[in-house]
Amino acid sequence: MKYQAVIGLEVHVQLKTDSKIFCGCSTSFGSDPNSQTCPVCLGLPGALPVLNKKVVEFAIKAGLATNCSITQRSIFARKNYFYPDLPKGYQISQFEDPVCQWGWLDIELNGETKRIGITRIHMEEDAGKLVHADVPELEDGSGVDLNRACTPLLEVVSEPDLRSSDEAVSYLKQLHQIVTWLGICDGNMEEGSFRCDANVSVMEQGAEKFGTRAEIKNINSFRFVKQAIEYEIQRQIDLIEDGGTVVQETRLFDPDNGVTRSMRSKEEAHDYRYFPDPDLVPLVIDDDWIQRVRQGLPELPEHKKQRFMSEFSIPAYDAEVLTASRPLAEYYEECVACHHDGKAVSNWVMGEVTRGLNDSGLSIENCPVTPRLLGGLLKLMDNGTISGKIAKTVFDEMWKSGKEPAVIVEEQGLVQVSDNGAILAIIDEIMAKNQGQVAEYRSGKDKLFGFFVGQVMKASKGKANPSLVNELLLEKLKG
């Protein structure tokens, strides 16, 4: 019997605000435990929450970028449950009226496009964190760090439109790209800034009714998402084929062993006893506010990708790579403004610039070779001042010193040799030293031509004009 997986993702996006969602405490990561708390995020009696306006703006941005409708009157609700890291005994979230609804993202996989629905995006506060190790004060037990409590989150809930782990990862990567592109999330999955829960079920191929789902909680890498979903799909299929029944439950992914493990029975909405939070008035978002946010949106990745392809005549692969992050796309576009050959710039940004960044551990924002310097280097290649090989030498020196490419070329005597007489003299010398190879070439071994080119370039220390070398060599070797 064949089975079909059905997958929906709930993605938690930690917002990059300076302060928390309902108080003025800092959201910075890595501070001493419980050093960024106040009566509001500690849940002390009488402390009242005040909504952070920046959180609402970020939510509207996310909704517009994912083709959602913005709810113009939404409310906050209390989600009631007990856990040691939840000091109030409830989480302030949204239930019936989320801030964004009914959006979508298109994903591309194996040359095909598929639209994935987004049910809702809602604002909520994060809980604290239980610390099970490295707590000197506790010999045997756990500590509670409430620095993260009240940190602003968006929860992005997809429709159950995903049918494989690859589709889930593709959707997740696109959502990650959008929220980091907008600047509303740093996207750091290791620190929990972007994490997801995967709802997975299986049904017989062609069936209309979905199977019983299991929810895999808090997966924090794309690789783990793929592994967890694939394991869970196979676990459920094996269970059904053995005559068992899939139980609706919450599971955790164990990355060390590549398996999911049962955590608890899966709660339904009524288990949380949602009701409107009496301490927070309804949130009203008027048309003017939505329009102001819309006007402030940057050009989004997919639109920029298509524009790069049409405006700069680069292939889809290049455009995909260059729009992987907003800073990289902006760097490329600034380079093209300095040197108008879009494909040449693309080759250098994807090649030498990326290599330099990887080797030095730098981000594109801190690249020592500015767009102006790279543009200047490419102009020296275009006008024949230096060869492509010499350009790489100049680039490495620019990376180290930040000097102008023309200055480096002059200081190191790297100007390309385009004098026929000088190049012919080198060719004559090479042919005199390699008479055997000359005879073999003239007898039909054309592949030896590359050998002669290499010898001439070596003798000229890479400065001979390659096209002129090829032209003159062909003439001389003909005899």
From Swiss-Prot:
Q: Which Pfam families match?
A: GatB_N, GatB_Yqey
E.C. number: 6.3.5.-
What is the reaction catalyzed?
L-glutamyl-tRNA(Gln) + L-glutamine + ATP + H2O = L-glutaminyl-tRNA(Gln) + L-glutamate + ADP + phosphate + H(+); L-aspartyl-tRNA(Asn) + L-glutamine + ATP + H2O = L-asparaginyl-tRNA(Asn) + L-glutamate + ADP + phosphate + 2 H(+)
Q: Does the keyword Nucleotide-binding apply?
A: yes
> Does the keyword Nucleotide-binding feature in the UniProt annotation?
yes
User: Which GO BP terms sit in this record?
Assistant: glutaminyl-tRNAGln biosynthesis via transamidation; translation
Which GO molecular function, any one, fits this protein according to its record?
ATP binding
Leader sequence residues: none
InterPro entries from the entry? Asn/Gln-tRNA_amidoTrfase_suB/E (IPR017959), Asn/Gln-tRNA_Trfase_suB/E_cat (IPR006075), Asn/Gln_amidotransferase (IPR018027), Asn/Gln_tRNA_amidoTrase-B-like (IPR003789), GatB (IPR004413), GatB_C_1 (IPR042114), GatB_Yqey_C_2 (IPR023168), Gln-tRNA_amidoTrfase_suB_CS (IPR017958)
Keywords attached to this Swiss-Prot or TrEMBL record, sorted alphabetically, are: ATP-binding, Ligase, Nucleotide-binding, Protein biosynthesis
Write out the similarity annotation: Belongs to the GatB/GatE family. GatB subfamily.
Q: What is this protein's function per UniProt? A: Allows the formation of correctly charged Asn-tRNA(Asn) or Gln-tRNA(Gln) through the transamidation of misacylated Asp-tRNA(Asn) or Glu-tRNA(Gln) in organisms which lack either or both of asparaginyl-tRNA or glutaminyl-tRNA synthetases. The reaction takes place in the presence of glutamine and ATP through an activated phospho-Asp-tRNA(Asn) or phospho-Glu-tRNA(Gln).
Subunit architecture: Heterotrimer of A, B and C subunits.
Q: What is this protein called?
A: Aspartyl/glutamyl-tRNA(Asn/Gln) amidotransferase subunit B
Output the lineage of the source organism.
Bacteria, Pseudomonadati, Thermodesulfobacteriota, Desulfuromonadia, Desulfuromonadales
